[in-house]
Structure formats: C-alpha cells, structure tokens
C-alpha cells in the first residue's frame, strides 16, 4: 500500500504550496478515511515533509483507536486551551504529528464553527507543510461552512466494495454544488 500513498502524496504536493490544509471525508462511515489520512501523513513524512493528521470527526473519532491510545487530550483540548494545537498531539514518526479529538463534550460539533478552530489549524499550518483533517462523513462536512469551504481543499474517500457508484457521484456533485474545492477522489480498499 505504501506506493499508493506515496503517489497520493506526490499528487497532493503537485498542487503547489497553496494547498496546506486538506479535509478528508467520505459519503458514508467505514470508507477508511482515517486509514487514508494516516497513510498519506506517513507518506508525506517519509518524503521529508512535516505533516499533521487531526481527527475532526467528533461524532465518531477513530484516530486514537487505530493508534491504541487513550483519547484524553487532543483537538477539543486545544480549542479550550491557549496552547497551540501541536501541544495536544504526538509525533508518531519523525515528521508526522497525530492529534486525536480529545474528550468530546455534547456541544463539540459547534466548536468546529468557531474562529478558534480555524486559528488552531492555521497555527499548525505554520509549523507543518500539510495539515490533514480527518473529517466526518460528507453530509456533515456540507453542513459545516468551515469544513466545506474554510480550508484549501477536500479529498473524497470512496471504498471499492462499500461505496455505491451513485453515492460516490452524488457526494461529488453535492460537494461541487456547495462550492467546495474538491482536490480528488481516493479509491480505498482496492488492490
């Protein structure tokens, strides 16, 4: 799988320096967004780039599960505190910072619509070459002006055996109709 993620990283980097923050979403849960985020981040780090993966899926956080880590601190801690978001993550491998969601209080979804969230991500952009935002499903991204249009672009992950063509096409159309900058579609689960 590593060469596929390296290809994805090269394609992303070929878009230029103006692409610093990328939202990764899918038409439905289970398409493998978190895996794609981790693979892309590791590939970027392996190429000498400084990357960060931030779990923004507050309804169904997965990053800490995949890492076998507790979810005591992370994005939500950074949104409540005054320290940079980088402080609430950990360097998994040289060049790859991983920031889980942290504790998820009931009103957390609205916190992604705050200036503090955008400032926290922009702060990471100053420290990292690419910030990868592991987002909720596309329907939730479309409900969020910050996630759908507040960053440099969106990667849509579709799963080869789980995502129907109609769901993939419909979600692509919905994102484009909403004015999102769709950078590409990643086919996951195909070998």
Model-derived segments and spans:
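Hydrophobic positions on the alpha1 helix immediately C-terminal to the Walker A/P-loop
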Residues: 36
């Amino acid at each position: 799988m590593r060469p596929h993620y390296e290809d994805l990283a090269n394609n992303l980097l070929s878009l230029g320096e103006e692409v610093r923050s990328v939202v990764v979403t899918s038409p439905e849960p289970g398409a493998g967004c978190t895996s794609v985020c981790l693979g892309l981040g590791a590939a970027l780090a392996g190429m000498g780039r400084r990357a960060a993966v931030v779990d923004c899926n507050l309804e169904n956080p997965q990053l800490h599960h995949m890492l076998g880590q507790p979810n005591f601190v992370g994005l939500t801690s950074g949104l409540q505190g005054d320290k940079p978001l980088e402080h609430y993550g950990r360097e998994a491998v040289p060049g790859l910072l991983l920031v889980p969601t942290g504790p998820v209080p009931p009103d957390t979804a609205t916190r992604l619509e705050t200036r503090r969230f955008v400032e926290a991500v922009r702060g990471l952009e100053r420290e990292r070459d690419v910030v990868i935002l592991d987002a909720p499903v596309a329907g939730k991204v479309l409900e969020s002006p910050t996630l759908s249009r507040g960053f440099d672009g969106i990667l849509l992950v579709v799963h080869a055996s789980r995502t129907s063509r109609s769901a993939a096409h419909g979600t692509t159309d919905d994102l484009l109709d909403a004015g999102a900058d769709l950078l590409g579609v990643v086919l996951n689960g195909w070998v």
